[in-house]
Amino acid sequence: AADSERYYDPLDYRPISITQQPDGNWTATSQDYVHLVIVGFNRMGRSLLLEALRICHYANYDDRLPTDERIRTHITLVDREMESQKDYFKAQFPYIESQIGDIEVEYCHDDICSTAMRTRLQQWAQNKHCMLTVAICVHDPDLSLSLGLNLPHEVYQHQCRVLIRQDFNNDLSSIVDDEQGRYRYVKVFGMVDRGMKKNILQDKLALYVNYLYDCCYTDESLKQKEVLKKMYE
């Protein structure tokens, strides 16, 4: 990527497909699912969680299936101070998880370097249906790099995505971004000197998709359709 921009793979970095049956219903043909592991439930970690809860809704979730057979997005939060961090988050957003049925959130009071967590990372990385992304969000930039570059080798071997928080872009960050070997899918993020552009924050594309869906499948009021139609045009 150019110096002025960085490109990141989406969390669903393999296509999630569905097919239309003769009766008109849609059925999932992909068993793949997104699994986001957030290390460090600080302000950055909470922001990533909230954004993931907003966007990680995929077409192969089918609420017609029995509850235990539905394909859900998984989010695992790991922090050594999770109990206190979790209480703070739940006080801010007491109802957020109960309103989302297609995402499972797990809070782990643990260290990402513990034997138990490393074993779980290995298992997730080796699962052929799991699209694993590990986001290292700890404050200390040196510790963040160390954690992100020393995950179980299965994470890199199976081309899982790794995001490492860095406050500023430096030579080592650039080397990691340009790596084409073991760390090919490791990227740094969060640099304060590389702020988000205004157009990234726009939700027009989502509105367009919603407009087309409503026109095809729902009896939404004409007034709202006309408003969205003007935006689409």
Regions inferred by a protein language model and the residue ranges of each:
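Cytosolic regulatory regions of ion transport systems
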Residues: 1-233
